[in-house]
């Protein structure tokens, strides 16, 4: 504390030299604040969280495509979502949308990826569009026996012509495709069914 008092006594803040010191301190402070704001905005763009809380899955939520950072490498992407399913009674016998990127509707062309709860079983169907011989083909993978009445995570990881699906961080499915995997550039449509969903 005595050092600060000594420094204050040595510098006359009303003099030209004192005003320069004040200007430098203010400039450094402003630069630090601007730097923090820029880094925070870059972090938020690179690591988006679309929903900070769970959303009821019987409510349809749309994440606009402009908020989604697409992969710079064709056929490389990862989607991870946390899901809670109470039971299979709601809309029994019908595919239930967890999320779809692109066209809405089970097995519609150019949805990649699409994730659905199977009509009558506790399994998740993952649909990806691939391109082979100038033709779009929908490929399907089935993740059987997901947990009921507790939260679980599902991650879909596409790498060139193969896809890996992880349930609670453990590899469950790995599948190569003959065509190139297409990542749709449309909106992400989440839910519209029942239960709760939380995704990043």
What does each model-identified segment do?
Residues 1-200:
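Extracellular glycan-associated modules
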